């Protein structure tokens, strides 16, 4: 299992040591056809929003490995994203960053939204002004995958 995306491990060497691959969303890169190794099992998964937030106009921001993926997910789930701001992966938001985001959102009458991963790194006194986009993965045949992980 490997994360795929920018600045991640190359697929071919990673798959040689992997036992299974979880493909999130559509197999746009045709991984299952290109890399047919005997030792690999492929599982598909879909991202589901845990809570559907109120219909608002959003200013989305994140500091994860694939910020554009987060923004695309929001829009694909029907969120009205008017503005976006990307930070580096694992970014530690400063109070100055958060004040700037809040000011920009207020000027344009937007609500701030970020990933759950980023939300937990934000000081608590700012969280009340920021919506958290929580997701879960739905994996058909998850029991088979769990057995594979245990064995």
Label the predicted regions.
Residues 11-17, 36-37, 53, 106, ...:
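Short, conserved loop/helix-junction motifs that constitute active-site signature segments
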Residues 1-35:
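Phosphate/Mg2+-binding loops and adjacent switch elements
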Residues 92-110, 117-118:
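A short, acidic, amphipathic alpha-helical segment used as a generic capping/interface helix at domain edges
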Residues 15-25, 39-59, 81-86, 133:
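Conserved beta-strand/loop subsegment of P-loop NTPase cores
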Residues 18, 63, 112:
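Residue-level signal for inorganic ion chemistry
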Residues 53-95, 147:
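Redox- and metal-dependent alpha/beta enzyme cores, enriched for Fe-S-associated oxidoreductases
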Residues 27-34, 68-69, 119-123:
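Short, charged/polar "capping" segments at the starts of alpha-helices
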Residues 88-91, 128-151:
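Short, flexible loop segments at boundaries between secondary-structure elements
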